[in-house]
């Protein structure tokens, strides 16, 4: 059976009955070095440019920023962080929420923090925060205030 495939950015035609599964993946896989380089670039962009704050962030947008495609992006994130794209993005959002809520002088309403961090709903923010931290954002903020008063 003849089929079309994509290798790099060039289109090719192959007889798929003659191509082993490992050869298919080998021809489309990134080298470990290239994969690590792209992941480091992604980490830098996430931390410095805070693209996770975009509530319409997609694999396609991030892949375009990195000059790769969504398949490679997913593979890189999974291989390097052991997370899906969505979980990876949300990890940055929750880390930023923790940072903001750890500041006892920050009185920004939770709804505003949720929106600022790219969450489409406050309930999603609450649920993810609680599953990651073990308490709701309100509980976390109150705990920070209590600890601040004790000092």
Per-region residue spans from a language model:
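The DNA-contacting recognition helix of HTH DNA-binding domains
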Residues: 70, 121-123
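ABC-family nucleotide-binding domains
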Residues: 118
């Amino acid at each position: 059976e003849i089929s079309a495939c994509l290798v790099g950015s060039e289109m090719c035609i192959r007889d798929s009955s003659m191509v082993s599964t490992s050869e298919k993946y080998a021809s489309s896989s990134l080298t470990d070095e290239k994969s690590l380089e792209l992941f480091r670039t992604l980490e830098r962009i996430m931390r410095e440019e805070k693209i996770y704050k975009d509530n319409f962030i997609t694999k396609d947008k991030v892949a375009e920023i990195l000059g790769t495609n969504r398949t490679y992006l997913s593979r890189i994130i999974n291989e390097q962080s052991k997370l899906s794209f969505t979980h990876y993005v949300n990890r940055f959002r929750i880390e930023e929420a923790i940072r903001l809520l750890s500041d006892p002088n920050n009185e920004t309403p939770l709804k505003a923090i949720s929106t600022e961090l790219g969450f489409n709903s406050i309930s999603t923010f609450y649920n993810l925060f609680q599953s990651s931290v073990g308490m709701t954002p309100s509980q976390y903020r109150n705990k920070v205030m209590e600890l601040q008063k004790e000092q």
